[in-house]
Amino acid sequence: MKLSTALVLGATATGAWSYAIPQLEQEVLELPETHYEQQEKYLIELSPYQTRWVTEEEKWALKLDGVNFIDITEDRNYGLFPTLDAGSYVNYPQKMGYVDTVKGLIAGLSMDNMRKDLENFTSFHTRYYKSSSGVESAQWLYDQVSKVVRDSGADKFGATVQKFDHSWGQFSIIARIPGLSKKTVVLGAHQDSINLFLPSFLGAPGADDDGSGTVTILEALRGLLKSDIVAHGQSPNTIEFHWYSAEEGGMLGSQAIFSKYKKNQADVKAMLQQDMTGYVQGTKHAGQKESIGVMTDFVDPALTSFLKNTIVTYCAIPFVETKCGYACSDHTSASKYGYPSAMATESTMENSNKHIHTTDDKISYLSFDHMLEHAKLTLGFAYELAFAAL
């Protein structure tokens, strides 16, 4: 996830951000002629249809300045936020229909599981998507997801866990729990982390960004598969859990997945992204009530309304509306390819974790009680839509 930060390098972009593009031009010095290897450049989009070619170093400079972007180099000809097809509008339930069942499943969610998983997940030096340890962490996560599915017995009824390979090394992960139709509900988080100062060398435990979201939806998957109806493939709709690679590089992994889904005409009815689910200190220091942040910009309004209803029904804390700006996480990719998306996070943006993208994004700053509330909403969201007439 991209957040504003005070950790700004001298070479970062400057200028206010209100859909104005920070200037990256540098003074040209007269130096002796020297032949340099040309740096690879990437096409990024900083707001709808506002693009720029940048080097990788310029990418990180923008992120340090709190500037969001999506890297569209691989699919630059696809229009962003296209008009949904006439038949693709989704009517989400106006009220929850399976409260007793979902609350029974919620009772089985475990903070101990999330803590253990996050301790292991943050033990890798970095989960930077181009690093060898980023591949190792992805393999560890794949093994955990596979074990959850096997232990539930869902694999005997068609459930699968697949690696979605990418050119940069770290793969994305897709757990698919088939239903009676191909109408699909996606729950997502990103698995990569980054240290913006020297991504290839410095540590990036990424406990909150987005280790917290990763283990939150993993625990929700455990809880969901305790339903025999779901595990046995008898829910009306299909449920998928995604762990995306390379979100920090500009939503690269999620774009690749939703691009393929669009080409294959996948019938995705809803996508919920969970990015940073564990930090509450900022909210408490501000003297505000602990809440779940619900994004209201660049999301689907109807799905966001359903998300709010889910929180009110299944969580012990309220929601608070907030905005993260353009291209702040992987729900952007779902929207880009015409799929309805929503996003939940730990707080309002101004109260969110400022330790991210450094070596200091540690478990010690996080609240597993708060992460449990996010797991509750994830489980409720998934189960209710698994049985909804979408």
Swiss-Prot record:
Catalytic activity, EC: 3.4.11.-
Enzyme class: hydrolase
Annotated disulfide bonds: C324-C328
GO molecular function, one term: aminopeptidase activity
Cofactor note: Binds 2 Zn(2+) ions per subunit.
Quaternary context: Monomer.
Name of the protein in question: Leucine aminopeptidase 1
UniProt organism field: Emericella nidulans (strain FGSC A4 / ATCC 38163 / CBS 112.46 / NRRL 194 / M139)
